[in-house]
Amino acid sequence: TGLEKKKENKSAPLLFNLAELQNECSRLFKISPDETLRITQELYEKKLVTYPRTDARVLSTAVAKEIYKNINGLRGYEPAAGYAAEILSGGSYKTIAKTKYTNDKQITDHYAIIPTGQTGAVRGLSAIALKVYDTIVKRFLAIFYPPAVYQKVAIIMKKDTESLFSSFKVLISEGYLKVAGIPASQNRGNKNNDDETEDVKCDAAMLELLQKLKKGDIIQAGEFFVKEGKTSPPKRYNSGSLILAMENAGQLIEDEELRAQIKGSGIGTSATRAEILKKLIDKGYIRLNGKTQIITPTLLGEMIYDVVAASIKYLLDPTLTASWEKGLTGVADSSISSREYLDKLEGYVTRRTLAVKQVNNQYMLRPYFDYAASFYK
């Protein structure tokens, strides 16, 4: 009763900033953000990649104009030589400044992490450092390739009074996927948890059959069955995804004005987020599984959370950070003076500190501690 056919383009992702690289390396290689930063710093010192402590995921206009040098240099790195030559031959690098991968407004101090094109020190890299370097190279080269193209076919069928829906998707042109190291058969990022239906991957033969369908055709049904499932709780953070959550902490703020203030800053900076996690681990507040990189709270961590939540809950709300950022913005644009801002800040801290000193909630907290402890036996 219904038939829709359309093509869908999927462009290469933006370049790596430090948080994205830490997340990717945690996922692919099961290494901690601290280790990723250490390795990337080593690559930088060996002049293999650009400055690592950056929040930007794009190129500057000035760098885009000279990007030929970076690509041409990668012809000396055997795994990327063919791709680099293909890009130079096709000339796609000449227009990169006009794409979403170049944006001066999205850069504060440093542009995205990219290979420099100097490859002399590659031979001396450890196995894991070489993997990180290769990941950066592939992400960089991918932006010069066309989008991957998918063919989608959505079908609405009717049996008596019941309507049945099916959606099929097949890759017809791999585009950037061939350099990104993602197999054509792997359909990453195509699931949408908000959708009631999910695209079914199919091969070329199945696609050809679907392409011949016309509205009104009668389809022979082999069998009907009910597929049951359960909703799952959100996945636990790993070391990489927690870094991204810190970077984007403001997304949970409902107030649009305050959310805008914290956008682009979040918790910590690209240079300090890994160290913040390391400090929490060293103090015994959270635990890191070295093999899976999954992060879980400790009993001590949960108890501290309960104390803060009961005593000064505002410290757990990203809105507080956003309001402070708003004040700093006011100082920067001269809508308020630095003295006025500091007076308000000092007054707030003083009032909250005095309030906490007067709190006597030890007995109220005991049930929370006992409940948390029951999960750590």
Language-model region placement:
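Metal- or metallocofactor-binding catalytic centers and their adjacent structured scaffolds
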Residues: 1-14, 22
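Basic, low-complexity terminal or inter-domain segments flanking catalytic cores
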Residues: 4, 8, 33-34, 52-377
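A conserved hydrophobic secondary-structure block that centers on an alpha-helix together
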Residues: 28-36
